[in-house]
């Protein structure tokens, strides 16, 4: 019985983290959204299905953790791309950053 409660708590935390990540990614995400309703339906359906049919007891929890990892990684990638977008610096700018000065080019 204690292990079932522990599994429920971990599954709940995973779902809570997924919801948190979805809120960060999609500002319109709310309990009224289709994504939220689908997530809750799957969680409720899984409680019954896992006990009856699943070969691996925590298979759906593993899938949920994988999905959480995917959402989190995608969000972090987007944040990094947004932060560092803008292209590369010119040779002159890069040299100036490290305190170097390029020799002057003679005009022909």
From Swiss-Prot:
Alphabetical list of InterPro entries matching this protein: FMC1_homologue
GO CC terms in record: mitochondrion
Annotated family: Belongs to the FMC1 family.
The protein's name: Protein FMC1 homolog
